[in-house]
């Protein structure tokens, strides 16, 4: 009788250990980086989906975004804006790796992290590209006077409804119009000065590009140009999604 009990206990422990090892192998740590003017809140649909499949998830606010206490004028340098992600990546133990997911403008912060911490990133996922062109009713601030360059801009409701959220639920658009914050008006020169990428570091990280067919801020020909000139390891196209794919097609993004 005692022998049977010991055998049963041993069998149970063996099954438990095998299950635990398999579960550990299936778990990944996703780090989600939002786009301009947004915050961690824009991932509210994707976070529970990832967690329900056993993954760890960290979604946080870049400087002067979401509920980050910094004011937009407190982050005049690109490195200031990236700092929350930089500090988080620095805190990760060297033996651990994360999956970085950057949406649109957030891909710049992600690229900076890839250059500094390539050994801590298993794969980087770029979700659509950053916007350019007609910003419609986006508000521009000139805190240093009208004769000086602009200091920040805030996405307008018309711009968001027509260019970013045109296929997303109206509730998500409404949420965005209430929560977006100003973004410091960084110039191309600012990024060129502080965002220097190398093949040895940035280029050593596996990259996945996710494109959408209804993205109104970037045309398909530009998306294909990005793919040709950046050499991602994998490209995924999501049909029927606007730029805010985590809002309009969260399940497809998860897949």
Predicted features by range, described:
Residues 37-45, 57:
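Serine-hydrolase catalytic-loop signature spanning alpha/beta hydrolases and amidase-signature enzymes
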Residues 132-201:
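Helix-rich cap/lid subdomain of alpha/beta-hydrolase
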Residues 35-39, 104-105:
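Active-site glycine-rich loops that stabilize anionic/oxyanionic intermediates
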Residues 246-255:
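Post-His helix in hydrolase/transferase enzymes
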